[in-house]
Amino acid sequence: MAQQQGQGAGTTTVAMMSRNPSYYYSGEGELSLAVQRQDSLYRDASRAGQHEQAHGEGWARTLRLAFQCFGVLYGDIGTSPLYVYSTTFDGGIRHTDDLLGVLSLIIYSFLLFTIIKYVYIALRANDDGDGGTFALYSLISRHAKVSLVPNQQAEDELHLHISKSSSLRRPSVQRLASTAEERAQWVKDLLENSRPVRISLFLLTILATAMVISDACLTPAISVLSAVGGLKDKAPHLNTEQVVWVTVGILVMLFAVQRFGTDKVGYLFAPVVLLWLLLIGGVGVYNLAAHDVGVLRAFNPKYILDYFRRNGRHGWVSLGGVLLCFTGTEALFADLGCFSIRSIQLSFAFGLVPAVLLAYAGQAAYLRVYPDHVGDAFYASTPQVLFWPTLVLALAASVVGSQAMISCAFATISHSQAMGCFPRVKVVHTSRQYQGQVYIPEINLLLGAAACVVTVAARDTVVIGEAHGICVVLVMLITTLLLTVVMVLVWRVNIGWVLVFACVFASTESVYLTSVLYKFAHGGYIPVAMSAVLMGVMGVWHYVHVRRYKYEMERTVSTERVRELVSRRELQRVPGVGLFYTDLVQGIPPVFPHLIDKIPSIHTVLLFVSVKHLPVPHVDPSERFLFRQVEPQEHKLFRCVARYGYRDRLEDARDFVANLVERLQYYVRDVNLYGAAANNKVSYPSSRCDSMGIPKSASYAERLQLQRARSVAMLHSHSQHQRFIQREMEKGVVFILGESEVVARPHSSLLKKLVVNYAYSFLRRNCRQGDKMLAIPRSQLLKVGMSYEI
């Protein structure tokens, strides 16, 4: 049991701690309670983000997840052979040896970024099973106070504490560990003490989020359009407009099936992708044997140097097409919540890599003989007897490729919303077994509409490819920067390896970025415009959220004011329990006096409830609630913080109230059992009383009898309190929701007025309301409105 004075004097904090409290003497000779506890949040933090599901995972489950990986993760990477060569050589092949250079670029880019960076490094930088840029941001938030919302609590410090490495090391190892810890502490201090650095980190995170969402719109457009384009070979009468509208029809069906969930879609699509990979791998082997097996020389990286030496600036520009070979790698990371590391590595190494590399090598062998067919390299290199099966599988696999990025967008938005960086939308958990599998109806509708608009407007895979490339490489570059911070702050890797990682990946990704930005006017503006809008939405929402929180925090109601309000003669105590929802995690919100002034009555038991998301995936239900009692105790006013991880789903109102009241009764019991002992400050050794306040001069029998009497009285007292709370709950529960209207101050700048009064107001009116997010029954809902000038 831990007891302390909370913010806003007169509040007593008792967290649901160990059942065996111990005592310690402070430096002033005072007896205090000591808490020794390691809860599930502590254990999550001490893992440093290591998602080791495979350690306790059976092979049957691993193989089943590996099978689903094909249907969810690999569609985008697996369908890249449809358009990589045509986009890279959009001006034609100048020299047949250029094919060796491009194939070598594809091989080593694929190995470097997809295998080394994502499959073997980034997947291990997950946040206890969650991947993506926001998961990296939350992982950093657990090790440094980088959040812009000032709602951290001392209890969170305990839960998010990082266990120190054992001091029982060899001297040389200990010196290295000490240096790494000093370096990590320096980075931690920089992140916590520099507001510009924290803002920059946040902006990079939401930029990556915006790019991922934009990519979820562009991937379906380019994948399906490139697959449908193969119809022109067998149906020359089809024009571009007809191909575009066929693509739109397929896109509509794709987004319509998203509501069935990733779990079902994965089982449905996995056989399709497996057949597709077997087909393109087999066709690749055929082309190597039939045309030019010598292209396998491209595994020698010297052909990359020869390619750039021969083509110069043109070779640099062509990198915008080469990078399309590793599109979809971010989905491997962001969709990790649905799968395990071992299942991804297994299916990737033995299924995806051989098939895709054989497909690229086979096309290169074919184009060495028929370079004029580069505009339709994939279908032209496919044997005619396999054309129709290939076309059907290409269409199906393109749909699957789109599924990977759509799932990635859903997961990313779910994380960002939980961290207060995205407007409130409905998140549907589509699987009871895997909480990372979600579906967001509003986002699905917007993504589907945007994909159709881009397809109709662009009408060409080359234009969409340029836009697609910017999304891919920007997200990868931001991931590299965040991974570098994780290596220093969380993993505490040797600085040499950190520099190698940062230099190699940041430099190569920057070269790719400059290449795609060169063609900004030829389609690159599409994701930039979409991301700018999305960043604006997230930035406005988060900015006003932070400002509103600070406004309420600066105007918390004092203890004297609370006593005055609840002691009014005209104030009536209504039977039942009232749950007053507020964003504040400490203190009484300013809307409470407003409620008393308008409606001079409150419930017999009143709890100020804050729903708070911690930067961890899950919070154990037994550790969900923190309570404080607002003094004086006879008024039955409590503060409650309900803590969730960003992947936890909120319970419905009935279950939430039942769990809250149960924990509140435990809290009342603990206050009665330990509260008095914790408040006793015993001067040792001059005190005439022991730690229980019993005179030392009393005989042993008298002391024992007095202890028993007090124990019986305390048990009887807390039993009465528990029964009282239970009776009040049975009389009814009312949910009181503070609806604050936020406006800019009259003398604010024009920009601030536009952001707060118009942009934020529009978002707030059109997103889901708080009562729907909290699943509050309308028959038990009371809304209290108040205007804030920020």
UniProtKB/Swiss-Prot annotation:
GO terms for cellular component: membrane. One of its GO terms (molecular function) is potassium ion transmembrane transporter activity. Residues 1-64, 120-198, 258-264, 340-345, 407-437, 491-492, 541-790 are cytoplasmic. Signal peptide: none annotated. Residues 86-98, 220-236, 286-318, 367-385, 459-469, 514-519 are extracellular. One of its GO terms (biological process) is potassium ion transport. It is found in: Membrane. Keywords: Ion transport, Membrane, Potassium, Potassium transport, Transmembrane, Transmembrane helix, Transport. It is a multi-pass membrane protein. Pfam families: K_trans, K_trans_C. InterPro entries: K+_transporter, K_trans_C, K_trans_N. The chain crosses the membrane at residues 65-85, 99-119, 199-219, 237-257, 265-285, 319-339, 346-366, 386-406, 438-458, 470-490, 493-513, 520-540. Belongs to the HAK/KUP transporter (TC 2.A.72.3) family. High-affinity potassium transporter. This is Potassium transporter 22. The lineage of its organism: Eukaryota, Viridiplantae, Streptophyta, Embryophyta, Tracheophyta.
